């Protein structure tokens, strides 16, 4: 194995950047060339079919089978112009990845010959095996039927020679088995709730759209080094490895010069993104060595989420071409920053108003404050649901590690905006407001744009920060599907806005004027949500103590955090807003707990194998060298001198023996703990057992191995070390 390590280093030293050439010097010449967007639809579809598609996208109007046939035929004609041979229904099962089954256009004609055909029926629906994907017990193996159904709001696209049709994935009995179905429901729920609130201010607003701008962080590692680390290959992270003498402490990687091989990879990634209509805009070095980021311009949430799933697939495929492997695990290396996926979330009206941006007048600012304050209340009431949406076996290693937001949910507004909310509380009383009081309050509200111009600072330790015209949810992990957090946030926001509107309307029914009713409920909401507002250092111990005093939860136990998917508040949101039914919600919990269990189980097995079959033999081989050295010393030197000269080696032999014995004992104990957990029939008990009885062994075993790495001869150490993984370019 040590030979493989040095062979990998030798191979890496001979790598050269690949030459990458864009199809044209003008981006607009090829942007969206592989997407069946509206421009292509106009070209390839009859007028009635084009109108039917646009009505379906904008108004939700159903598409008839006859029209579907016309659309399918036009889509096939366009795809054939790109040399496409197959089509697939592209969907997002509960695996945190995507799935696809490729079918050819080939069919037998009436004369027995072969023809190419793609019908509306094939476009609209297919039947993959639902029992082979995570389903939380909804589908048994003998109940395999599931359906994929075309999501007309997300355009079809071409990858290589395959036409990909974005779809939802449901069971034969109608339960959602994917991320897209509940995401679309959550977006519809917040659209309706937000529109109803907007109409208190402006009757011209008839729709509210959710926008998402994600920031994808990732690590790159040379494929030779990757293949020489079985833990990276099988788990996505290093289960062992002593910290490099130099890592990120000099802060010289962030925004630094991008290495040539990485630049070539990034260029090709951007070209492929742009062909697929993904508006990739920003690329840069991140904080940790060999860590990078890609960020696009924000888009409609559903499309943005599809694009993020596409980007993660593209990264893996293109990286291999450049002799890299992409690491999307949240914490592939201990001791340096992990990777997140910031979700920049905003709500915009069909009249062009960003509801999280201050208006141009007091009325516009009242609308802004209404949505700002309700967002705060949403986070406060649903902190456990938001945490559950981002909690996983991998993300837990990142949260609160002085690099990412803590597991405590809080909101950062900036001191000036917080003061504005406090001023509203001070000025709004319980009695009827005088015209003068209303004028004073509205004048104060009118100053908000000036306040935000210079004083909306950025607090990198805040999990849910207001950044001037959006909220940035920073707790989501780099490998996650954005839909998980977007479902939680949008469903919870819909629930909160519905409550707000009902409270305002109740006061209006009692004879209170509309403006005053809004101010009174805003005041109540500001006071109630005050514990969630925090401007300080989210990494500090003082904040943990203060958060506890405020009643904010801090759950770092993964299964315990996930169990909050089915607490009363989460049910009132997810079931109450009709995002899930009871069966679907329970199945989601089961899937997440089973995923957690399996990931820890795999890590335990891989670490046990590497420890016993790679590390222990290497340590014993080195120990034997030392013993041979001692025998040689004893033959040459007198007894008294021998004792002095051999003391350090004897101590090292003793240390290695202690470490080897400890590793063997701990691996044996971990294996027994896994066996006990595996025999538990209840998936909840099994997950808790893996969290409490199995996972702690991973760090204990690692500690002994990392010490051995610093004691054993570098020439025989079998696995690439951190300095090689992180600093070889």
Where are these regions (language model features)?
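Composition- and surface-driven signal marking solvent-exposed, interaction-prone regions
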Residues: 232, 308, 330-331, 357-361, ...
């Amino acid at each position: 194995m040590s030979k493989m390590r040095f062979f990998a280093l030798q191979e890496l030293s001979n790598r050269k950047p690949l030459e990458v050439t864009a199809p044209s010097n003008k981006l607009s010449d090829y942007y969206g060339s592989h997407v069946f967007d509206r421009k292509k639809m106009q070209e390839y579809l009859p007028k009635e079919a084009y109108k039917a598609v646009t009505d379906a996208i904008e108004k939700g109007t159903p598409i008839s089978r006859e029209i579907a046939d016309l659309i399918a035929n036009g889509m096939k004609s366009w795809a054939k112009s790109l040399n496409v041979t197959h089509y697939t229904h592209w969907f997002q099962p509960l695996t945190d990845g995507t799935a696809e089954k490729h079918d050819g256009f080939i069919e037998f004609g009436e004369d027995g010959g072969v023809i190419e055909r793609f019908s509306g029926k094939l476009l609209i629906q297919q039947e993959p095996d639902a029992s082979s994907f995570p389903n939380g017990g909804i589908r048994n193996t003998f109940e395999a039927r599931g359906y994929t159904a075309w999501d007309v709001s997300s355009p079809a696209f071409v990858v290589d020679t395959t036409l990909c049709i974005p779809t939802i994935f449901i069971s034969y009995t109608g339960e959602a088995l994917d991320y897209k179905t509940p995401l679309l429901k959550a977006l519809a729920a917040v659209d309706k709730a937000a529109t109803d609130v907007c109409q208190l201010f402006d009757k011209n607003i008839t729709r509210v759209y959710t926008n998402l701008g994600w920031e994808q962080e990732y690590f790159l590692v040379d494929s030779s080094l990757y293949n020489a680390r079985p833990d990276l290959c099988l788990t996505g992270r290093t289960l062992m490895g002593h910290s490099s003498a130099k890592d990120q402490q000099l802060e010289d990687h962030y925004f630094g010069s991008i290495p040539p091989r990485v630049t070539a990879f990034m260029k090709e990634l951007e070209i492929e993104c742009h062909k697929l209509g993904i508006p990739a805009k920003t690329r840069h070095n991140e904080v940790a060595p060999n860590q990078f980021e890609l960020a696009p311009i924000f888009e409609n949430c559903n499309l943005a989420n599809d694009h993020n799933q596409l980007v993660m697939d593209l990264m893996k495929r293109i990286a291999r071409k450049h002799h890299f492997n992409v690491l999307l695990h949240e914490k592939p290396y201990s001791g340096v920053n992990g990777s997140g996926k910031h979700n920049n979330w905003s709500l915009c009206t069909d009249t062009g108003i960003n509801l999280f941006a201050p208006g141009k007048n007091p009325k516009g600012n009242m609308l802004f404050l209404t949505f700002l304050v309700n967002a705060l209340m949403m986070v406060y009431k649903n902190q456990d649901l938001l945490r559950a949406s981002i909690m996983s076996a991998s993300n837990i290693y990142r949260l609160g590690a002085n690099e990412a937001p803590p597991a405590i949910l809080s909101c950062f507004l900036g001191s000036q905006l917080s003061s504005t909310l406090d001023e509203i509380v001070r000025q709004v009383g319980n009695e009827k407001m005088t015209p003068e009081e209303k004028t004073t309050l509205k004048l104060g509200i009118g100053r908000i744009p000036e306040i935000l111009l210079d004083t909306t600072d950025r607090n990198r330790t805040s999990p849910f920060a207001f950044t001037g015209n959006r909220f940035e949810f920073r707790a989501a992990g780099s490998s996650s599907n954005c839909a998980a957090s977007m479902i939680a946030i949008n469903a919870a926001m819909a629930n909160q806005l519905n409550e707000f509107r009902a409270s305002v309307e109740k006061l209006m029914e009692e004879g209170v004027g509309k403006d005053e009713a809004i101010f009174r409920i805003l005041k109540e909401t500001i006071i109630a949500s005050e514990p969630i507002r925090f401007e300080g250092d989210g990494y500090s111990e003082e904040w943990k103590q203060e958060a506890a005093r405020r009643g904010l939860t801090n759950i770092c136990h993964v299964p315990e955090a996930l169990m909050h998917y089915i607490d009363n508040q989460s049910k009132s949101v997810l079931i109450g807003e009709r995002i899930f039914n009871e069966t679907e919600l329970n199945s989601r919990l089961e899937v997440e707990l089973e995923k957690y269990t399996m990931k820890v189980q795999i890590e335990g097995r891989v670490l046990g194998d590497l420890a016993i079959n790679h590390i222990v033999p290497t340590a014993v081989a080195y120990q034997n060298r030392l013993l041979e050295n001692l025998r040689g010393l004893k033959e040459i030197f007198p007894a008294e001198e021998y004792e002095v000269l051999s003391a350090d080696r004897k101590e090292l032999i003793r240390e290695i023996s202690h470490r080897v014995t400890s590793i063997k004992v701990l691996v044996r104990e971990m294996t027994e703990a896994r066996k006990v957990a595996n025999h538990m029939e209840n998936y909840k008990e099994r997950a808790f057992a893996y969290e409490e009885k199995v996972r702690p062994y991973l760090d204990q075993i690692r500690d002994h191995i990392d010490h051995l790495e610093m004691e054993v001869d570098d020439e025989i150490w079998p696995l690439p070390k951190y300095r090689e993984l992180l600093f070889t370019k």
